Amino acid sequence: MTTQQLPFPIPDDRAHYFVTCYADMHDLVEDLVVPDGVPEAAATVLRTARELLRQSYYCYEFSTVAVMHSLIAVEIVLRDRIPDAGKKPLHGLIKQGAADGILTARQAEYLDYGRQIRNGMAHGQTTHAVMPPAMAVPMVTTSFAIVSELCATPAG
């Protein structure tokens, strides 16, 4: 583990497994653009997830946090799109979204997989998990895509 020192952060030793320099991180996240029409609460969460991926050059674990964080944006939008969402957990929102045709079967499958990963980490079942950026970027991209698709459809 790299010890951070001021005045500049030091790249995580593992960063060089996937990029040669910090500037390469911009290419890694360049397609993660928040589209118009996304509620500001979800847009802020997606931008934060993107920046966590970018900063995983300095703290490798940020890529894992980015995946977990990006699911928050999906949950925000699902709550907005699903009638009577109330305080249902994400699992319930995914099931209802699929049943109501708000989510496709494929979207529901991806979200449920991400939810299981998130829950495993959040509830201590999966500890010391580090998701390399090569795995994290497609998962965060999926959250961006699902939010974009949900927001392209008028709320019911």
List where the protein language model places each region.
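Amphipathic alpha-helical interface elements
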Residues: 2-116
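Charge-enriched, short contiguous segments at helix-coil
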Residues: 105-156
